């Protein structure tokens, strides 16, 4: 029998995980790469698991009229994400060139993917945003630096959107190069990440801010990596 003091010392020497969320999404492997076109009715998305969220980022309010679904696929070169977003009204920047990166995109309707391919480096991750009119933003995040968001980083991720006005549904498809994050995926890989959505006009207090894995209400609340969920890459 191991002496109690030795057992306690052994337990204390094992690093505790910094993550406090166990929510997970499975990302399935796809053999053939494809370019995003915003059509989420195509066969590749029909049988993959979906994660659904309709609560605000703290989990205290629910917005069933803003039901959001997200799914993921991966290949040897890319990780893909698809969003289905119920909406009330569309709020976007008007008359701008969607080919150009848009700083402050989070102040309009947007879906956001936060990805950490190296979970041991809790404060280092990547952010990808797309709006209903296909404007975009990508950032490398390092919370140990000031400023913590590097807008000069360019992932060359591809994205496309479609809006179904009859169903009050806007859809987004993303394809993110693994090389941009200096990583690769094999079956069994596990990343950390979160999915967010912003909807509505006015201040943050007036808008609807949703999260897949809930976070603590605080300044820069979305940047709370200890609350990132698990993305499991399966065959």
Model regions and ranges:
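Sec-dependent signal peptide recognition
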Residues: 1-7
